[in-house]
UniProtKB/Swiss-Prot annotation:
Catalytic activity line of the entry: Hydrolysis of terminal non-reducing beta-D-galactose residues in beta-D-galactosides
Main location as per UniProt: secreted
Leader sequence segment: 1-21
Active site (catalytic residues): 186 (proton donor), 285 (nucleophile)
Gene Ontology CC terms, in alphabetical order: extracellular region
Known role: Cleaves beta-linked terminal galactosyl residues from gangliosides, glycoproteins, and glycosaminoglycans.
Places the protein is found: Secreted
Lineage summary: Eukaryota, Fungi, Dikarya, Ascomycota, Pezizomycotina
Entry protein name: Probable beta-galactosidase C
Family note: Belongs to the glycosyl hydrolase 35 family.
Glycan attachment positions: 25, 195, 274, 389, 441, 512, 519, 600, 675, 713, 757, 808, 897
Class in the EC hierarchy, top level: hydrolase
């Protein structure tokens, strides 16, 4: 807690040079000082959100996400560029195919009107396999990763050069959206010496990016308040970036205990003043949610992470700390499709983010929008000094106040929250503020539990100035008149005074709020009690004030008329209240064209202030409007509530054995021979030959091994596998299941002693025994996992005979994903497939035709599999949403459930070739898996059938049978939409070709 009241007290903590604002000296239009970023000479509050295009493999949907974030107050997107997504093998890069086409990312950002903060690594983290390192390099070849090691440099520098040039071509200097470029990621500068290996490594990154043509400011993100790294203002010995950033995940929230956490950090300001005092305060990653692990609580069931109150209190606290650059991690999480995840996460990467994995808008995003729209129109907020903070501003000591003051305009911003930020008690208090008319005691300010407010003084609204206002400002517009929007919780009291206005202006109130006026020495005080819905005050000087309750404010949009400009001015947007989403607002001739999405039939209100507009359309259809007494227009737009969605039943299954490799006579002549006695990896194997899959070019996905040995008196084998948390494995001797491990969410390396039964499993003398081991895979480790970090090996660490020292394997062979590093399915990329038999043959791909002549039958997943067995199932379906399918957004997923008698199992689901579900029913937590349009085909109006190929594999990990008694399509919400999701997506769905050589 900080109980000092005045800036002079604060200054005792810091060096006098804190007062000196340092400007940037880059050659780009992006500049900075100690207050904020400036672009083209205008200060900007950077309200960014993290988005990972790798987790949404349909490029067209990137625009959908960007439009939703822009409409909800964001003006920038922070993006990791993952090396492993673009490079399947050394020297090979793909920046053009499908979801690898990063130019489309930049183009969509420009179209939506959002800036890009580029984060190219080379190490990224982000709960992605190997933290984003190319998997072909993460097999031990990286050497001294994240150091100046020349072996490491030789591998990462080509990547950074190539992606650096692409980013450079899309900088704001070139007409693109990129305004900042981050060097590395959360790299802690533990030693401040010029010859330190980390310093030299950061210098190498700077040199590579400079040579690639990067001229916008560089940034870095400190890994919490643990070290002081790469700031020009603190022990700069090299490697420092232009703008220091801090990552913070302060919530301390619990999915199982709703009363836990919710504790604010109130020391950001002090931290930045100590370590980056000439730079704007930048929270490069601020908690927008959090990931949950295998065996944890699923995101939809974690109410504490989804609460909109978190966005209200924590993001306003950042404002109080004088932060002017903020990026929420994540804004949209997406899906860990294929095998892109690190072992700490499962298929969903929803992250409890403001925008759901299904691309649906959560209440948390609606609440976030209220602050985003406020910062967009508040330039005085971008040049403030800390006037003071503490509990002495209010009556009673239970309210904490941040007091910020713009020294040039005298505008003040008082951020108030309960001192105990986790309190759920409602409180009422008075607040003393300073205004241009002197000190004022604002009375009767209410805070509900877990609520925060920004009280403003001397705040300009066009030609009008608020001397003070105790309600939250949502936004304002300067149109034909000045229009202000305020919001409060229903029943709360707000007061405001108009500076330099005539006393007792006449006014008319519309709606359910009650308004009174009274005299004061500073002017007329207007006091109101917030009613439900929309209220408005029309003053005789034409000033218009909207009074909105919080839930109505959630449905408030201020779409800009200049779509591609992220820096929206008050005279460049209009107001639309009521829809689920407003994507765009454009004026063509005398028509205002609105596009967007809507859930239920809704009354909307529009204030555009343009006398030349004579008609309004919504998604191309003319609206019948009525004019209100205060100049807005009202209309009704349709929703999707009356549309019946009938999902097809998944029937007509075809099934085939998925583990023919356990047959001792199986032909593995085309498999890779494991014959290495040394490894790229520094971790010594437990036995020879080396069985690390990465040494043989197989990286992502399950792998299968076959080891041969002669007659033996051994009593068994000890198998040790390492394939990520929760990854299980099974073993068969001469076609007979002999055991395995079911996987543990807290352990990534597992070992088991498998006993031989000589009477049933071992071959007689002179014959050959075959041990087959099938291993699951949950990803490569990130940098924080010892001993070898992202280079921890995958596959089998060793297989050792028990009871015999003379028995040895005569050979080992291995199969992984078809083609290994050749990346034979370039569009879906190098991390989509694994080494299951049916995958290698392409059974999961559209166009594959199962034939009863080749061992296929009509069993369904509900029929199940015997213990220690593995089957593949395939069916087709058509999704017809009706004649208006092009104007609907109906997120679809698949629900899986193991039967009550099912043993531990692994189930995978592929849709049109994309692996979109990794289901471990004995571990959890996920049971419903969303499918994205583009991966999913939706029947259009063109007439031809757009089929979907759905494939399921079911693997019983023990000798217990396993079955899926539920495999069904489910719908999430349904919305009318201007975004066409029922397109021809065939370019994203390459069809089956013969792959028999990979058997």
């Amino acid at each position: 807690m900080f109980f000092f009241r005045f800036l002079t007290t604060v200054l005792l903590l810091f060096n006098a040079k804190l007062l000196v604002a340092q400007s940037s000296n880059t050659s780009s239009p992006v500049h900075w000082d100690k207050y904020s970023l400036s672009i083209n000479g205008e200060r900007l509050f950077v309200f960014a959100g993290e988005f990972h295009y790798i987790r949404l493999p349909v490029p067209e949907l990137w625009l959908d996400v960007f439009q939703k974030l822009k409409a909800n107050g964001f003006n920038a997107i922070s993006v990791y560029f993952y090396w492993n997504h673009h490079s399947a093998s050394e020297g090979v890069y793909d920046f053009e195919t499908g979801g690898h086409n990063v130019q489309r990312l930049f183009d969509y950002a420009k179209q939506a009107g959002v800036y890009i903060i580029a984060r190219p690594g080379p190490y990224a983290n982000g709960e992605l396999s190997a933290g984003g390192y190319a998997l072909w390099a993460a097999n031990g070849r990286l050497g001294g990763e994240r150091t100046r090691d020349s072996q490491y440099y030789d591998l990462w520098s080509p990547w950074m050069t190539k992606i650096g040039k692409i980013i450079a071509a899309n900088q704001i200097t070139e007409g693109g959206p990129v305004i900042l470029v981050q060097h590395e990621n959360e790299l802690q500068e533990t030693t401040h010496r010029a010859n330190n290996t980390l310093v030299l490594y950061m210098e190498q990154i700077t040199q590579i990016l400079d040579a690639a043509g990067i001229v916008v400011p560089s940034t870095h993100n400190e890994k919490g308040m643990r070290s002081m790294s790469w700031s020009m203002d603190y022990e700069d010995v090299g490697g420092a970036v232009n703008i220091y950033g801090l990552d913070s995940y302060p919530g301390g929230l619990s999915c199982t205990n709703p009363n836990a956490g919710f504790n604010l950090i109130r020391t950001y300001y002090q931290w930045f003043q100590n370590y980056s005092y000439t730079q704007p305060e930048y929270l490069a990653e601020f908690q927008g949610g959090y990931f949950t692990p295998w065996g944890g609580v699923f995101y939809d069931d974690c109410a504490s992470m989804l609460q909109p109150e978190y966005a209200d209190v924590f993001y306003k606290n950042n404002i109080g700390n004088r932060v002017t650059l903020q990026s929420l991690y994540m804004a949209y999480g997406g899906t860990n499709w294929g095998h892109i995840a690190a072992p700490v996460v499962y298929t969903s990467y929803d992250y409890s983010a403001p925008l759901r994995e299904t691309r649906e808008i959560r209440d948390k995003l609606k609440q976030t929008k209220l602050l985003g729209l406020f910062t967009r129109v508040s330039p005085d907020l971008l040049q403030t000094e800390m006037e003071g903070n503490g509990t002495s501003y209010t009556t009673g000591a239970n309210i904490f106040t941040w007091a910020l003051r713009n020294p040039e305009t005298n505008a003040g911003f008082y951020v108030v929250a309960q001192d105990d930020s986790s309190s759920t008690t409602d409180v009422v208090f008075d607040l003393e503020v300073e205004t241009s008319a002197g000190s004022v005691n604002i009375t009767n300010i209410g805070l509900d539990g877990r609520q925060s407010k920004i009280i403003t003084t001397d705040y300009k609204v066009g030609d009008t100035t608020l001397l003070y206002c105790s309600a939250d400002i949502l936004t304002y517009a300067t149109l034909d008149v000045d229009v202000l929007a305020l919001y409060l919780n229903k029943g709360q009291t707000g007061t405001f005074v108009l500076a330099n206005a005539a006393s007792h202006l006449k006014y008319t109130v519309y709606g359910n709020s009650t308004v009174t006026s009274s005299n004061s020495s500073q002017g007329t005080i207007y006091t109101y009690t917030q009613g439900q819905g929309i209220s408005a005050i029309k003053f005789s000087n034409r000033f218009l004030v909207y009074l909105l309750d919080k839930y109505t404010a959630w449905d408030f949009f201020a779409p800009p008329l200049q779509l591609s400009d992220p820096n929206v001015k008050p005279n460049e947007h209009i107001f639309v209240i009521g829809p689920y989403l407003v994507r765009e607002a454009t004026i063509k001739g005398r028509t205002l064209e609105l596009t967007g999405d809507n859930q239920n039939t809704t009354s909307i209100e529009i204030y555009h202030g343009n006398p030349f507009i004579t008609s309004i359309t919504w998604n191309g259809k003319h609206l019948s409007t009525k004019r209100t007494a205060y100049g807005s227009l009202t209309a009704t737009i349709p929703g999707a509530e009356a549309i019946t969605i009938t999902l097809p039943k998944l029937t007509s299954w075809k099934s085939h054995d998925m583990i023919p490799e356990i047959d001792p006579e199986y032909d593995d002549s085309n498999w890779v021979v494991c014959n290495k006695t040394t490894s790229f990896n520094a971790i010594a194997p437990l036995s020879l030959p080396v069985l690390y899959s990465g040494d043989y070019g197989y990286h992502a996905g399950p792998k299968i091994y076959r080891g041969r040995f002669g007659s033996t008196n051994a009593t068994g084998v000890t198998v040790t596998a390492q394939n990520g948390n929760a990854a299980g494995w099974s073993a068969w001797l001469n076609g007979i299941y002999i055991g395995g491990v079911t996987g543990d969410p807290s352990i990534e390396a597992t070992s088991a002693v498998l006993k031989f039964n000589s009477s049933t499993t071992l071959k007689q003398e002179g014959s050959e025994n075959v041990l087959t081991v099938l291993v699951d895979y949950t990803g490569h480790d990130e940098d924080n996992v010892k001993p070898a970090r992202a280079q921890n090996p995958r596959g089998l660490l060793g297989v050792i005979f028990e009871g015999s020292t003379s028995t040895n394997f005569t050979s080992w062979k291995l199969q992984g994903n078809a083609g290994g590093e050749k990346n034979i399915d370039a569009l879906r990329g190098p991390m989509n497939e694994g080494g299951f038999y049916g995958e290698r043959l392409g059974w999961h791909l559209p166009g594959f035709e199962p034939s009863t002549k080749s061992g296929w039958d009509t069993r369904a997943p509900s029929d199940g599999v015997d213990g220690g067995s593995h089957r593949f199932y395939i069916t087709e379906f058509t999704l017809d949403l009706g004649p208006n399918s092009h104007a609907l957004d109906v997120p679809i997923g698949i629900h899986l459930n193991a039967s009550s008698t099912s043993g531990p199992a692994v189930a995978y689901v592929w849709l049109n070739g994309y692996k979109f579900a990794h289901y471990l029913p004995h571990i959890g937590p996920q049971t419903v898996f969303p499918f994205q349009p583009g991966v999913l085909n939706i029947q259009g109006s063109e007439g031809h059938k757009r089929k979907n190929t759905l494939a399921v594999s079911l693997w019983a990990l023990t000798d217990q049978p396993a079955a899926l008694d539920v495999v069904e399509l489910v719908a999430y919400g349904k919305y009318t939409s201007s975004f066409d999701f029922a397109r021809d997506w065939s370019y994203l769905q390459p069809r089956w070709v013969d792959r028999s050589k990979y058997a």
